[in-house]
UniProtKB/Swiss-Prot annotation:
Record-given protein name: Poly(A) polymerase gamma
UniProt-annotated binding residues for ATP: 99-101, 108, 112-114, 166, 227, 236, 245-246
Organism this protein belongs to: Homo sapiens (Human)
Residues the record marks as site: Interaction with RNA: 152, 157, 327, 398, 532
One Pfam family it belongs to: PAP_central
Essential cofactor(s): Mg(2+); Mn(2+)
Family: Belongs to the poly(A) polymerase family.
Phosphoserine modified-residue sites: 23, 29, 525, 599, 648, 684, 708
Tagged with keyword Transcription: no
Stated role: Responsible for the post-transcriptional adenylation of the 3'-terminal of mRNA precursors and several small RNAs including signal recognition particle (SRP) RNA, nuclear 7SK RNA, U2 small nuclear RNA, and ribosomal 5S RNA.
Length: 736
């Protein structure tokens, strides 16, 4: 019996080695204390509504069953209308697949369902958005039905018996769709258009993730905890440059592969251990990328120069492999890595019995964290316009973050994913206002008593991008405005209610009081390390910008309240020369010369001449010698400035096979920049399996990032029609 038991254990261990691209770090089974900590983790998560009860789960199944029947009926009707033989119509089939958090089994109460409608080859996409849309319109229980055909992944959105559903469409090059269809088969992608491939990709990635984890239930519980933590800490948003649900799932799946037998409480701790020490931009891979003869574009930095600029690559496991985190910027990566380290310190305390899981789920003190903030405001005159406008502005905020990162004097631009309702007293002409806050860290300049910083171009190129996109999709309407204002921490009470600021401050002090040696971070004090006083000027400058219609009336000029902190509105012509190396044009035409002034507070000084007394912006790559910026400190900037690289480095050799090798604990993969491969090799003597095959990547901490494929703004035509839009000029002086 003992021999059989030993053989069983050995067989189990051999099987576990097939998960992931390296051997596991530990095969240790959980102890009793691990199960106790796991139960405590579950108890800590329950108040946040992350678990659905049986009744709610069954209701979702009923709704999906109804939707599946509707799809089959519709496909049958379409088949008849296209004169297919009755024998074919009877067996044509059709099916609904789910993906995303629901398919992974980690959806929360009230969450929507991502679903895919799969149809046979004779059903067109136009049928889906026309006849099926009409069928849904007349179906009982359907509410808020809307189609988004021009989206990156075209979708129909609706509520069905109280459940929100996002339904995408794909037709396969086969005559019938059986109930046991396996979408993981790569051959299903043959002869499909790109929109169908994108639609199928969600299901294929989700299913592949579930096939690549050793224990699905442990994976699900761990992922629930990590997703809740990420949302609570303000780093859950693919749109804003953090990570979305699929990316978090892949990071947790990789952790499960490395510790295949661990309990969820242990895996949460190991998650922070692994990714607080991960050497980005080495990619996270769940399996070796597979080649295919379908010749679809895949993520490969050896072949695609743009892939070398990705800062935090997490590669989807299903063909065609893609980087799910191409929106990540230098700032968002810095914030996330800091959060990984903080999470590791907290879970260390929890597993030592010094703290409990509720501490891990405490929100951050964002409004006490920084000395300087930029308030971004989006407003519209009607609720319907506001919903559209806010969605577009939010989707482009990462453009603003990128612009600010390229500013010579900015170390970090941290956007808070949560938006807030705006103060209507500041926007009397628009009743619908939303605000976002960006925490800013400015660089310390050596041997300078004061620094004059001009953020005008960074803001204007961002607003031009948004207005151009709105015009291109015929969204831009009278009353839609964007404004940006620089404020200091002590002035935030002009924008946010006291309970929000006080609550955050209280939590911050509580964190400090309860922190032990293991929780002391490397952050410097804001009050001691930043340049102290600042003087800034916000100039609202109206000028012509694109409109969707030639007869559109002019938008009224926004007048700021004189009580607004450190904000000075000077509505006058402003000529801002474009910064070197940026391709986004500033749209402008005839400028209204009307001038309105408001006396500034005594602490403010307005530069008398635009461009004078302002240190010119020179974009530079990040200097590794300066180290990572502390999230609430100031880093030094040297006098010697190196221009940004304007082209991708050449590749002398191209390895033939992707290979990822991780070290024990350090977990370094071999997707290395060739220039540092030897250095890293000397650091490592305990590599796990496989030989090193360097693939060039580029750490673009302070280098020029290539534009996202979603943002073809610089190449968009400049419209001839104009609508006058308020623009902000932001200049400030930082003193020691």
């Amino acid at each position: 019996m003992k021999e059989m038991s030993a053989n069983t254990v050995l067989d189990s261990q051999r099987q576990q080695k097939h998960y992931g691209i390296t051997s596991p770090i530990s095969l240790a089974s959980p102890k009793e204390i691990d199960h106790i900590y796991t139960q405590k983790l579950i108890d800590a998560m329950k108040p946040f509504g992350v678990f659905e009860d049986e009744e709610e789960l069954n209701h979702r199944l009923v709704v999906l069953g109804k939707l599946n029947n509707l799809v089959k009926e519709w496909i049958s009707d379409v088949s008849e209308s296209k004169n297919l033989p009755p024998s074919v119509v009877a067996t044509v089939g059709g099916k609904i697949f789910t993906f995303g958090s629901y398919r992974l089994g980690v959806h929360t109460k009230g969450a929507d369902i991502d679903a895919l409608c799969v149809a046979p080859r004779h059903v067109e996409r136009s049928d889906f958005f026309q006849s099926f849309f009409e069928k849904l319109k007349h179906q009982d229980g359907i509410r808020n039905l809307r189609a988004v055909e021009d989206a990156f992944v075209p979708v129909i959105k609706f509520e069905f018996d109280g459940i929100e559903i996002d339904l995408v469409f794909a037709r396969l090059a086969i005559q019938t769709i059986s109930d046991n269809l396996d979408l993981r088969d790569d051959s299903r992608l043959r002869s499909l258009d790109i929109r169908c491939i994108r639609s199928l990709n969600g299901c294929r990635v989700t299913d592949e993730i579930l096939h690549l984890v050793p224990n699905k239930e442990t994976f699900r519980l761990t992922l629930r905890a990590v997703k809740l933590w990420a949302k609570r800490r303000g780093i859950y948003s693919n749109m804003l440059g953090f990570l979305g649900g699929v990316s978090w799932a892949m990071l947790v799946a990789r952790t499960c592969q490395l510790y295949p037998n661990a309990a969820a409480s242990t895996l949460v701790h190991k998650f922070f251990l692994v990714f607080s020490k991960w050497e980005w931009p080495n990619p996270v891979l769940l399996k070796q990328p597979e080649e295919s003869n379908l010749n679809l574009p895949v993520w490969d930095p050896r072949v695609n120069p743009s892939d070398r600029y990705h800062l935090m690559p997490i590669i989807t496991p299903a063909y065609p492999q893609q980087n799910s985190t191409y929106n990540v910027s230098t700032s968002t990566r810095t914030v996330m890595v800091e959060e990984f380290k903080q999470g590791l310190a907290v879970t260390d305390e929890i597993l030592q019995g010094k703290s409990d899981w509720s501490k891990l789920l405490e929100p951050p003190n964002f409004f006490q964290k920084y000395r300087h903030y930029i308030v971004l405001t989006a407003s519209a005159s009607t609720e319907e316009n506001h919903l559209e406008w806010v969605g577009l502005v939010e989707s482009k905020i990462r453009v603003l973050v990128g612009n600010l990162e390229r500013n010579e004097f900015i170390t970090l631009a941290h956007v808070n994913p949560q938006s807030f309702p705006g103060n209507k007293e500041h926007h009397k002409d628009n009743n619908y206002v939303s605000m976002w806050f960006l925490g800013i860290i400015f660089r310390r300049v050596e041997n300078a008593e004061s620094v004059n910083i001009d953020l005008t171009y960074d803001i204007q190129s961002f607003t031009d991008t948004v207005y151009r996109q709105a015009n291109n999709i015929n969204m831009l309407k009278e009353g839609m405005k964007i404004e940006a204002t620089h404020v200091k921490k002590k002035q935030l009470h002009h924008y946010l209610p006291a309970e929000i600021l006080q609550k955050k401050k209280k939590q911050s002090l509580s964190d400090v009081n309860r922190s032990s040696g293991g929780l002391q971070s490397k952050r410097l004090s804001l009050d001691s390390s930043c340049l102290d006083s600042s003087r800034d000027t916000d100039n609202g400058t109206p000028f012509n910008s694109p409109a969707s219609k030639s007869d559109s009336p002019s938008v009224g000029e926004t007048e700021r309240n004189s009580a607004e902190p450190a904000a000075v509105i000077v509505e006058k012509p402003l000529s801002v020369p474009p910064a070197q190396g940026l391709s986004i044009p500033v749209i402008g035409a005839k400028v209204d010369s009307t001038v309105k002034t408001v006396s500034p507070p005594t602490v403010c000084t307005i530069p008398t001449v635009v461009g004078r007394n302002v240190i010119p912006r020179i974009t530079t790559p990040h200097n590794p010698a300066q180290g990572q910026p502390h999230l609430n400190g100031m880093s030094n900037i040297t006098k010697t400035v190196t221009p940004k690289r304007s082209h991708s480095p050449s590749i002398d050799g191209t390895p033939k096979r992707l290979k990822d090798v991780e070290k024990f604990i350090r977990l370094e993969s071999t997707f290395k920049d060739p220039r540092t491969a030897e250095e890293r090799k000397r650091k490592s003597v305990d590599a796990i399996g496989g030989e090193s095959m360097p693939i060039p990547t580029i750490d673009t901490s302070r280098k020029k990032r290539l534009p996202s494929k979603e943002l073809p703004d610089s190449s968009s035509p400049v419209p001839a029609n104009n609508i006058r839009v308020i623009k902000n000029s932001i200049r400030l002086t930082l003193n020691r």
